[in-house]
């Protein structure tokens, strides 16, 4: 199966950190294509970034069977919003993401900071969007001084990974974090492949035993 891992960086992330992470290295070693979402609108509305991410995911969906998105910090909010808008994301990983908001006023009065604020209208609006969403792995850094453990937990069912002895930035360079994320992503890929096989068997059963496999 063709599979791609999309990384969405945090606030004002330069993008050059992604190629250096063990997540990317492990993903490529395990046969995943990797893509960095080049977010040049980091200081603009999060909704604009989410819409741009939806467009990218739609394009990748034409050539890949499995799409997993990893969002670090603010990038996780953008990814969750894209999923809520119906982007064909199979799995979502958020790392140090302020799902419950945070008091970031010390970073200045930028509109994006207000959107990430505790109980903000933006966060409430995304949570209220109806529809199914992909499985989510929420990664929490034990020594994160920007996003608390409670703030990093999504408002919906999720798998939680708490990483000891690392902070908000260091967590994406932690090998054990990368290993767990890739194990989770590979298990998700296996589930998707099994569903495709079940669908193919059901389709062939309806058409007759000598019918060719269904094409997607």
Go through the PLM ranges and name each one:
Residues 9, 38-40, 96, 140-142, ...:
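Residues at the C-termini of beta-strands that transition into short coil/loop
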Residues 1, 41-47, 195:
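Class I (Rossmann-like) S-adenosyl-L-methionine-dependent methyltransferase catalytic domain
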Residues 130-216:
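C-terminal catalytic-base region of ester-bond hydrolases, centering on the histidine
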């Amino acid at each position: 199966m063709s599979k791609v891992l999309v990384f969405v960086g945090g606030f004002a992330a330069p993008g050059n950190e992604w190629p250096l992470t063990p997540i990317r290295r492990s993903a490529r070693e395990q046969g995943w294509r990797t893509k960095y979402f080049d977010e040049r609108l980091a200081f603009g509305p999060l909704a604009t970034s989410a819409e741009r991410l939806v467009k990218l995911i739609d394009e990748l969906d034409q050539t890949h069977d499995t799409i997993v998105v990893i969002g670090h910090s603010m990038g996780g909010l953008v990814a969750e919003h894209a999923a809520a808008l119906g982007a064909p994301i199979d799995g979502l990983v958020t790392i140090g993401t302020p799902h419950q908001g945070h008091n970031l006023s010390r970073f200045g009065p930028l509109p994006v900071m207000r959107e990430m604020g505790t109980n903000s209208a933006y966060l409430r609006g995304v949570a209220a969007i109806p529809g199914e969403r992909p499985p989510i792995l929420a990664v929490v850094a034990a020594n994160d001084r920007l996003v608390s453990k409670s703030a990093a937990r999504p408002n919906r069912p999720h798998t939680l990974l708490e990483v000891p002895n690392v902070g908000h930035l260091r967590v994406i360079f932690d090998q054990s974090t990368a290993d767990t994320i890739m194990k989770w992503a590979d298990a998700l890929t296996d589930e998707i492949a099994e569903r495709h096989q079940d669908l193919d068997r059901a389709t062939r059963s309806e058409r007759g035993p000598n019918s060719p496999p269904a094409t997607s």
